[in-house]
Curated annotation (Swiss-Prot):
Protein role: NDH-1 shuttles electrons from NADH, via FMN and iron-sulfur (Fe-S) centers, to quinones in the respiratory chain. The immediate electron acceptor for the enzyme in this species is believed to be ubiquinone. Couples the redox reaction to proton translocation (for every two electrons transferred, four hydrogen ions are translocated across the cytoplasmic membrane), and thus conserves the redox energy in a proton gradient.
Entry-linked Gene3D superfamilies: Cytochrome-c3 Hydrogenase, chain B
Membrane topology, as annotated: Peripheral membrane protein
Reaction(s) this enzyme catalyzes, per UniProt: a quinone + NADH + 5 H(+)(in) = a quinol + NAD(+) + 4 H(+)(out)
Pfam families noted in UniProt: Complex1_49kDa
Assembly and binders: NDH-1 is composed of 14 different subunits. Subunits NuoB, C, D, E, F, and G constitute the peripheral sector of the complex.
Keywords annotated in UniProt: Cell inner membrane, Cell membrane, Membrane, NAD, Quinone, Translocase, Transport, Ubiquinone
Signal peptide: none
Protein name as catalogued: NADH-quinone oxidoreductase subunit D
Any one annotated GO CC term: plasma membrane
Organism this protein belongs to: Thermosipho melanesiensis (strain DSM 12029 / CIP 104789 / BI429)
Length: 367
């Protein structure tokens, strides 16, 4: 029959996000793949140049919808680095708590995402429902379930109240009690082993060549985590481990996400204990924040997102708007760069497994 061109996405139910992959297949095996971006392109980096420094706080969470807090922190850290703004200690701890809650929510959602491609719909329902409990915390803390606009230059927008602290601890205890159920349903399921073990395998050399980070890299045996390698906030003051595996397949990536939830719970509980009383924001300007100007300079910051290394390179000319902001998205290497490398040789039904376990975020790639 020869090669057949198959248009996979953007509306395919197995596609994770609004982008497309043109695949050339023989039988049910992919022989060549070409990514086709652009369906979500909004020009985030250019839009930032047209908005005041503080106005960008409403824009940046939309760069990666499932993980808005990562962009908020990168933006704030870059501004603070150029402007030499000191952030209160309590605000630093609160930022850590928010980031780790977001990490837990994302990993739970990834259990939901992998459920569809392998037919494990119970996992999909559980992951979505339990993630919703984290969103309840965000709603009470920030007023929004998704686009929080909570982490701002100088600190955070609101303090943690005793009621929210209690809510966080109760939610973490609940999720921790649910993890054995996820382990039994997913990690100890013979059918899941058949669908994920040895499937969507990535070796260490290819991962490093593509610039893969996060769970995708750690699953190949490289325990690289910026929270340990180049600590920011107060990650060097808490005790946690970086889980890794040498198998490199889809099951290894799912397993690591499961293990990372335990570590994030551990970090949040330590942060709540160590967090001092005090203010949560340093005023960045006299009067209206819209008049804030960042001094002339440049900075690069990087942090560990759920998807891997996330970075911002920011340049200020001393004006009321950023001169240039470049976003180093974590999922770009493992999707649009990686698709051409790792999809050839894959069976068609395993393509959604690749995309799901490699944590695709389409708006971030199309920024």
């Amino acid at each position: 029959m020869g090669e057949v061109k198959l248009f996979f996405g953007p509306n395919h139910p197995g596609m994770h996000g609004n982008f497309s992959v043109h695949m050339y297949v023989e039988g049910d095996t992919v022989v060549k793949a070409r990514p086709l971006p652009g369906f979500l392109h909004r020009g985030f980096e250019k839009l930032m140049e047209r908005r005041l420094w503080y106005q960008n706080l409403a824009l940046i969470p939309r760069i990666c919808v499932p993980e808005p807090d990562i962009n908020e922190l990168c933006y704030a850290l870059a501004v603070e680095k150029i402007a030499k703004i000191d952030v209160p200690e309590r605000a630093q701890w609160i930022r850590m708590i928010v980031l780790e809650l977001a990490r837990i929510a994302n990993h739970l959602w990834s259990f939901s995402g992998i459920g569809g491609p392998i037919g494990l719909y119970t996992g999909s329902f559980w992951g979505t429902a339990d993630r919703d409990r984290i969103l309840d915390i965000f709603e009470n803390l920030t007023g929004a379930r998704v686009y929080h606009m909570y982490i701002v230059p100088g600190g955070v927008r609101k303090d943690l109240t005793p009621k929210i602290e209690k809510m966080i601890l109760e939610t973490l205890d609940y999720i921790e009690s649910r993890l054995p159920d996820y382990e039994k349903l997913i990690l100890k399921n013979r059918i899941v082993h058949t669908r994920l073990k040895g499937i969507a395998k990535l070796d260490r050399e290819t991962a490093l060549e593509m610039g893969v980070t996060g769970v995708g890299l750690r699953a190949t045996g490289v325990p690289y985590d910026i929270r340990k390698v180049d600590p920011y906030l107060f990650y060097d003051k808490v005790d946690f481990e970086v889980p890794f595996s040498t198998d490199g397949d889809a099951f290894a990536r799912v397993y690591l996400k499961f293990r990372e939830i335990f570590q994030s719970i551990k970090i949040v509980k330590q942060a709540l204990e160590k967090m001092p009383v005090g203010k949560v924001n340093t005023p960045i300007s006299e009067g209206s924040a819209l008049r804030f100007r960042v001094p002339k300079g440049q900075a690069y910051v990087h942090i560990e997102s759920t998807r891997g290394e996330y970075g911002y390179y920011m340049v200020s000319d001393g004006g009321e708007k950023p001169y240039r902001v470049v976003v180093r998205g974590a999922s770009y290497p493992q999707t649009f760069i990686g698709v051409e490398k790792y999809l050839p040789g894959t069976r068609i039904e395993d393509v959604p497994i690749w995309l799901s376990t490699m944590d695709v975020c389409a708006p971030e790639v199309d920024r």
